Every structure is written in structure tokens, then in C-alpha cells.
């Protein structure tokens, strides 16, 4: 993998501060994090222990996690940091009715960096607004999961030698799958040949994300059967149907187990160099008989979370300076004019569960493609927190 980065000139261009959404990251920033991860892997274990010595990393996980939580904590400890972990929610002050906002304010005073996972969309964005300490999003509802995306890209680059011009199929829960949303966005920087979105209609990619792909000139196809693209793709990105995201359990029962891959329907039917990725945990969508095939990279993918998350933590804490030829600068805000006094129509948005002022960003349409008389009607806005795009006539006034 070392040779893959020889042409990348590192200049510390990553904005030190927060890593919340792939929508905020430029191509160069992504590549810098991947390169730093590779450089960290090359360091001795003894040297790594000095990188974050004396730092306290707070891991606030408000929903269940095994890989992501343990990966962040292992990554931090291997860099010499101490861990301050939120106890199970039922044992914390959250159970007593403490707001998310107050929790972040308190934890900020105890730590140097906050890693947060939350079931509500936009929670990490809100945390980054409240905290003067850096925040890393470890997954917010069905919105974003940047650390998973960066380790996905690291794995793809390591295996394929490039991130450019690839064909990828996303299969399973694409509606609620934050890993899919994040990775699809990140890949727009790397000119994918085509993206295939394979899911039942009820679990297809949200329309606002498809519109973003169109805006970026990305070719994609909507499918319901992965066999329609299996012999064409470089990457098979499998996801589980997420029972916990369904408002009605009856809807989950209709689609559970709809996609299952195994030796019989994969081996001999795909490209010889195709790779299978999965953010894990799996349930029954990948049978174990695929685990020892050359296509299965999901366990290696999970292992790659250590150097990538180390890179992320060092970056937001400004501890990446010795790897770059100039200092980075702390940046914790953007100069954007927000529209206020409106209510987000996403019931899972953090703004509908905390006492905060909601902010929207006006999305400017291409006036050449719109009837001037309909400009006002067609106006679109993006919620600052959950990043959902909604039409003007769907907005409610606070």
C-alpha cells in the first residue's frame, strides 16, 4: 500500500476541528486522512503511544455498538490516550431526563475530544456546535457515518490500488443505511463509473441523495436484484436490513432476509477481482461459507478501522503536524448565512427533540432550468443538523 500514495503531496490541508459528515469533506482532506492512517501503521507501537499521551477521549454512545466503540477506544489507547466512556444510557443522567445538550456541555469539560453516536439524525452536528472541543461523528441515526466511510475507502484503496472509476453495488437497506449515504457521497470525489442501488422500493436511496448524485454528474441505476449487475461490479457493498430503524415492525417483517449471498450465488458469477464489503454486524445476509473466499474483505475492513480512526483523532486534535510540512489551523465553524424560524419535518432530527433554534441552508436552483414564475415554489432547503433536503411548501414555521 505504501506506493499508492507516492504522488500525494501532504500539506496539512485537513481542517482541524470536527469530522461530522462526508458532505463537509473535500477530496484532498479525505486522501490526507487515508495517507496519515498509512503512516501511522508504519510507526512502531512504542512511538504510537506518544502521539496522544495525556489526552482524554470521551466516547458517548447513546445506542448499541460493538465494532465502532471498541475500535475507537482501542485506537485511542494504542496512541497513549485515556478513555472516558459513557455508561449504558439506563445508568446515566440521560435516564433522569438530562438533555443531550447538557450532557455534551458537561462532557466537554472532562475531555479533549468527544466521539459521539446517537440514534437521532444531526446529533453529532449539534454536539459540534455546543462543544469547544473537537467532535467526531460515530454515526447519527440514518444520516452519516464518516469513520466507517473512511475505513471503507482505505480498504478499497489498499485492495484496488485506486479509488477512481470504480463500479460499486450497494445492496440492502439503502433508506436507513448511514454507511451507504456517507460512502456514496464520498465516492463522488473519485469519478465512479456507475453506482448500482439494489433494494426493494421501500428501502431505496432517499431522493435527496439521488438528486445530489445527479447534480454531481454521477451515473447510477436503481435495481431490485443484485444479479442484474453482479458480473460488472468491482465492489459489492452489502448491508443488513436494520430492524431498529423501522417505525413499524410489520414493515421490517416484509423485507427481512430479502437479500442473502453465499458461495452458490457469488462464486463463478462475479468478476474474479470483485470484493465484498460489509459495515457489520451481519445477521443472515452473508452466509459464513463466503468468509474464507478471496472476495470476502469485511473482517479486514473492520480491522482497518484502527489506523483510520487513529488518523481521524490525531487530525482533529492537531497532532498530525509531524507528518505534514506545515501546521494545521483549528477551524470549528463556517461562515454561512442560515435561515431560521422554520421547523424540520424529519421526526428523527435532533432539532425536534432538543430545545434549540433550527437552521436551514437555502439550496440555490439552476435558474436556467426553472420557470421563473415557479422559482419560489421550487425552492429547497437543507436542515443544518440532519442534512435532509425539503421543499419550501413542506416547511413549517416555528
PLM regions: where:
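Positively charged, low-complexity intrinsically disordered leader regions
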Residues: 2-70, 74
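Phosphate/diphosphate ligand-binding glycine-rich loop within oxidoreductases
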Residues: 44, 50-157, 284-287
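Glycine-rich phosphate/diphosphate-binding loop of Rossmann-like nucleotide-binding domains
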Residues: 62-75, 158-238, 380
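Rossmann-like adenosine-cofactor binding region
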Residues: 213-290
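Adenosine-phosphate binding glycine-rich loop
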Residues: 273-274, 279-327
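Short, flexible, mixed-charge glycine/proline-rich loop motifs
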Residues: 329-341, 360-378
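Short cysteine-rich clusters marking metal-coordination/redox-active sites
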Residues: 342-344, 383-386
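Cys/His-rich microdomains that often coordinate metals
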Residues: 348-353, 390
Amino acid at each position: 500500500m505504501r506506493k499508492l500514495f507516492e504522488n500525494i503531496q501532504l500539506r496539512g490541508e485537513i481542517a482541524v476541528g470536527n469530522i461530522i459528515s462526508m458532505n463537509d469533506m473535500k477530496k484532498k482532506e479525505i486522501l490526507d486522512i487515508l495517507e496519515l492512517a498509512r503512516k501511522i501503521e508504519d510507526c512502531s507501537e512504542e512511538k504510537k503511544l506518544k502521539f496522544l499521551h495525556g489526552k482524554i477521549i470521551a466516547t458517548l454512545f447513546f445506542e448499541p455498538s460493538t465494532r465502532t466503540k471498541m475500535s475507537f477506544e482501542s485506537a485511542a489507547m494504542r496512541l497513549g490516550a485515556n478513555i472516558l466512556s459513557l455508561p449504558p444510557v439506563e445508568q446515566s443522567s440521560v435516564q433522569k431526563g438530562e438533555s443531550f445538550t447538557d450532557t455534551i456541555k458537561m462532557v466537554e469539560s472532562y475531555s479533549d475530544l468527544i466521539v459521539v453516536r446517537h440514534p437521532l439524525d444531526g446529533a453529532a452536528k449539534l454536539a459540534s456546535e455546543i462543544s469547544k472541543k473537537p467532535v467526531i461523528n460515530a454515526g447519527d441515526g440514518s444520516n452519516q457515518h464518516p469513520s466507517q466511510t473512511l475505513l471503507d475507502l482505505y480498504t478499497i484503496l489498499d485492495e484496488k490500488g485506486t479509488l477512481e472509476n470504480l463500479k460499486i453495488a450497494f445492496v440492502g437497506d439503502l433508506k436507513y443505511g448511514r454507511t451507504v449515504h456517507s460512502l456514496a457521497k464520498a465516492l463522488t470525489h473519485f469519478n465512479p463509473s456507475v453506482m448500482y442501488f439494489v433494494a426493494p422500493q421501500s428501502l431505496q436511496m432517499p431522493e435527496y441523495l439521488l438528486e445530489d448524485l445527479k447534480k454531481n454528474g454521477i451515473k447510477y441505476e436503481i435495481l431490485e436484484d443484485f444479479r442484474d449487475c453482479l458480473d460488472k461490479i468491482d465492489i459489492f457493498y452489502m448491508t443488513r436490513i436494520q430492524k431498529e430503524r423501522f417505525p413499524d415492525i410489520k414493515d421490517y417483517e416484509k423485507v427481512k432476509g430479502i437479500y442473502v449471498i453465499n458461495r452458490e450465488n457469488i462464486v463463478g458469477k462475479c468478476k474474479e477481482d470483485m470484493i465484498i464489503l460489509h459495515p457489520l454486524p451481519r445477521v443472515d445476509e452473508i452466509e459464513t461459507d463466503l468468509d474464507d473466499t478471496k472476495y470476502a474483505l469485511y473482517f479486514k475492513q473492520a480491522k482497518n478501522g484502527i489506523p483510520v480512526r487513529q488518523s481521524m483523532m490525531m487530525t482533529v486534535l492537531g497532532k498530525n503536524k509531524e507528518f505534514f510540512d506545515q501546521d494545521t489551523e483549528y477551524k470549528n465553524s463556517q461562515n454561512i448565512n442560515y435561515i431560521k424560524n422554520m421547523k424540520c419535518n424529519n421526526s428523527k432530527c435532533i432539532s425536534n427533540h432538543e430545545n434549540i433554534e433550527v437552521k436551514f441552508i437555502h439550496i440555490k436552483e439552476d435558474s436556467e432550468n426553472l420557470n421563473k414564475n415557479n422559482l419560489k415554489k421550487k425552492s429547497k432547503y437543507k436542515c443544518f443538523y440532519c442534512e435532509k433536503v425539503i421543499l419550501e411548501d413542506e416547511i413549517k414555521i416555528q
